């Protein structure tokens, strides 16, 4: 498994992916992605490896019906915090969930639920860049927003998007994720709900 992750990380790097994009593709932390790209498949020093869990949800992501079912469960979690005007997906992997959740939430409430997209700083090549909400989707100012991502690894991206939303005059009401590897229950007063929480023993 580890050699396969190293191979995938090196392949993604050769295709021009940033460390943040590699981390997202492999569902690992940026530190782990950086470590993987520096390894060779023949000499792996396990002592130096960051403590992390690789998450593979290909069987879910490859099926639109499975994505719809899981998104409905995530929408159900979000609705306990009230009606949202906008569902914001964190690029790249949070966007399909957010799209399907907005549809489900609109059907449940009878109100139109818009879609917004956030591009986190970890996807930017410029060191001084900031994360940004795409101008091609819904505006968030004055709106009640549910934030959606696939995996929380460190919590930095979630904290970043909550800060950006508040700075733009939005009211984030909840964060929903498929998998939480960090055990985060709230970010800056915004509750975090996960379908699956991974805990390390020992």
Swiss-Prot record:
Highest taxon above the source species: Archaea
One GO MF term attached to the UniProt entry: orotate phosphoribosyltransferase activity
Positions of transmembrane segments: none
GO biological process terms held by the UniProt record: pyrimidine nucleobase biosynthetic process; regulation of gene expression; UMP biosynthetic process
Cysteine pairings via disulfide bonds: none
Family matches, as HAMAP family: GfcR
NCBIfam families: PRK02277.1
Domain notes: Contains an N-terminal DNA-binding winged helix-turn-helix domain and a C-terminal regulatory domain (or effector binding domain) resembling phosphoribosyltransferase (PRT) domain.
Protein name listed in UniProt: Transcriptional regulator GfcR
Source species: Methanothermobacter thermautotrophicus (strain ATCC 29096 / DSM 1053 / JCM 10044 / NBRC 100330 / Delta H) (Methanobacterium thermoautotrophicum)
């Amino acid at each position: 498994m580890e050699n396969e992750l190293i191979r995938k990380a090196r392949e993604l790097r050769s295709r021009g992916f940033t460390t943040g994009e590699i981390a997202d593709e492999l569902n690992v932390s940026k530190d782990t992605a950086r470590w993987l790209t520096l390894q060779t498949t023949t000499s792996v020093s396990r002592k130096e490896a960051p403590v992390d869990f690789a998450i593979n949800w290909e069987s879910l992501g490859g099926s639109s019906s499975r994505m719809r079912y899981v998104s409905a469960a995530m929408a159900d979690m979000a609705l306990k915090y009230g009606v949202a005007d906008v569902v914001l997906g964190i690029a790249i992997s949070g966007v399909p969930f957010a799209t399907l959740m907005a549809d489900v939430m609109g059907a449940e409430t009878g109100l139109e639920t818009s879609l917004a997209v956030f591009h986190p700083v970890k996807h930017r090549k410029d060191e001084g860049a900031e994360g940004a909400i795409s101008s091609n989707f819904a505006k968030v100012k004055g709106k009640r927003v549910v934030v959606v991502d696939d995996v929380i690894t460190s919590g930095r991206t979630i904290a970043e998007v909550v800060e950006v939303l508040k700075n733009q005059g939005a009211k984030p009401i909840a964060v929903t994720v498929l998998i939480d590897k960090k055990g985060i229950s709230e970010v800056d007063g915004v509750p975090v709900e996960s379908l699956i929480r991974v805990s390390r023993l020992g």
